[in-house]
Amino acid sequence: ALSSLTIDGTGSTVNAGTSGLLTTATATTLALNLKGTTSTGAVTLDADVKTLNLDSATAKNTLATLSATGATAINITGDQALVLTTATTNAAAVITSTSTGAVTITSALQAGVAYTGGAGVDTIKTTTASTKAVSTGAGDDVVTYGGPVSTVTAGSIDGGAGTDTIVMTAAQAATATATATFAASVSNLEVLKLSDAANSQTINMTNADGINH
């Protein structure tokens, strides 16, 4: 079955959703090699693929949609920027980046998805009631806050090294800092950016885990 897929140049749609049927054997690991591509359509992978090794090389790579609904482990490598506008994974996926390039995932991570960032700038969005650890690693990362994490199930947000920014609406920030719960669930975030700063709210920075900008 298909075990390696390379995409370069400008494209629209790549459907590898039947790769497990190409031969009798079924591949559960796929190497997706991106080499300076801009894809405006969906890149759809077989649900039998449980481990996706995604390498971003040559130049910046952008996928409008990556559908890897079977993937429980997604490993991002490479030295070029990667943009995933919409990424659909297994609901309990573990995404690990060791990339030195910037990694941007525009769509919100599902509540049960864990994320570990690399040395580059990670730009991600969480969702409310996240049950897993989200850590962006080194670099000046940006996390858009989707809502309170579930601390009962070890949900957390860790900005890691660098000067890291959390983006919230004013209402989210006011609610989050009204108690000490938010501060207990986040760490290593240095900058609070309000996406709607004109909206007047009272924010208690003493409950913001030391965020000071």
Residue ranges of model-derived segments:
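Solvent-exposed, low-complexity segments and loops of surface/extracellular structural proteins
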Residues: 1-213
